[in-house]
A protein has these predicted regions:
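Helix-to-loop junction immediately C-terminal to a conserved catalytic motif
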Residues: 51
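H-loop/switch region of ABC-family ATPase nucleotide-binding domains
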Residues: 181-182
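Helix N-cap at the start of a conserved alpha-helix in ABC-type nucleotide-binding domains
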Residues: 157-159
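Conserved ABC ATPase "signature" region
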Residues: 99-117
Length: 229
């Protein structure tokens, strides 16, 4: 594995008497990491802790170097405006001029195949198109780390394939990818490394092919058996 870009030590999140994330320790160094686990295992919560949307009740996250980040959710928020303006919004917050914002936003929409829908109200787009707008909005910011939480969970197969293509293109541009998915085929196509979480604890962290061919724990073996078609 490459040098770690994130070291997590004893990370925990407790709500009342419930431990949602329970003493997670791991180092992330792969360019493309997919977090797998059963429903309620803590996958999305872990990603939100890493992105800073939630504050841990214990442990620490250490970044050897600061990485610019963007996060895309299963159901992205679309502003009540055009697809183009949705992408421009983030660029404007980053301090680009109006001319730069429009140029960069149009380029980003073109990269996800939506240049022809730039002036369409974003909330009238299909679910797959909205997810591509969200990816364009994130990609326009040139993040060094892109975090994706179930980016294709609500999409049809064709839209899912298109989103996968875009994720791979973003990775090819140099960004690190950290994502969750329930689609095992998708995980195998995208990931270099699998982190398997169960009941808030990291159970396995292995190269993708090793995880799918020789899972080391009963929990992972059971998960693959239950989730495989």
């Amino acid at each position: 594995m490459s040098a770690a870009w994130l070291a997590i030590d004893g990370l925990g999140l407790t709500e009342g008497s419930t431990r949602i994330i329970d003493g997670v320790s791991l180092q992330l160094g792969a360019q493309r990491t997919v977090v797998l686990g059963p429903n309620g295992a803590g996958k999305s919560t872990l990603l939100r802790l890493i992105h800073g949307l939630l504050h841990p009740t214990g442990g620490s996250l250490r970044w050897p170097q600061t990485l610019s980040q963007a996060m895309v959710f299963q159901r992205p928020v679309m502003l009540r405006t055009t697809a183009l303006a949705n992408v421009i919004y983030g660029l404007k917050l980053k301090g680009h001029t109006a001319t730069e914002c429009e140029q960069l936003a149009r380029q980003s929409l073109a990269r996800v195949g939506l240049e022809g829908l730039a002036k369409r109200p974003a909330r009238l787009l299909s679910g797959g198109e909205q997810q591509r707008v969200a990816l364009a909005r994130a990609w326009a910011l040139e993040p060094q780390l892109l975090i994706l939480d179930e980016p294709t969970a609500s999409l049809d197969p064709a839209s899912s394939r298109e989103v996968e293509r875009i994720i791979n293109d973003i990775a090819a541009s140099g960004a690190r990818i950290l994502m969750t998915t329930h689609n095992l085929g998708q995980a195998r196509r995208i990931a270099e490394e699998i982190v398997f979480i169960d009941r808030g604890r990291i159970v396995e962290q292995t190269p993708v092919e090793l995880f799918f061919t020789q899972p080391q724990t009963e929990a992972a073996q059971r998960f693959l058996k239950e989730e495989s078609p």
